[in-house]
């Protein structure tokens, strides 16, 4: 998972299961402009299935699906 912002702003990157339960917060801070932020998520302890990551910034919310299959 990665993101890059065009201007400095507060960013929150979270992983959720499909029931809406927060699984993990990966980032919760001010993100610098033009910096590339990359995260590795270890889902080895989670059951197989579809999960969501949500990036919330001062200007937008982006939600994407991903799968865990062991």
Where are these regions (language model features)?
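Terminal processing/anchoring signals of secreted or surface-associated proteins
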Residues: 1-3, 20, 41, 51-53, ...
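Glycine-centered coil/turn sites that cap beta-strands in beta-rich domains
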Residues: 1-15, 37-41, 60
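A structural signal for beta-strand boundary/capping segments at domain termini and interdomain linkers
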Residues: 22, 61-63
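Short, surface-exposed loop/turn motifs with a glycine/proline- and acidic-biased composition
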Residues: 27-58
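Interdomain boundary/hinge segments at the C-termini of tandem beta-sandwich modules
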Residues: 68-70
């Amino acid at each position: 998972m990665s993101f890059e912002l065009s201007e400095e702003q507060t960013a929150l990157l979270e992983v959720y299961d499909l029931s809406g339960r927060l699984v993990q917060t990966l980032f919760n801070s001010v993100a610098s402009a033009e910096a590339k932020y990359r995260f590795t998520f270890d889902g080895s302890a989670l059951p197989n299935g579809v999960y969501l990551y949500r990036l919330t910034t001062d200007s937008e919310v982006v939600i994407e699906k991903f799968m865990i299959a062991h």
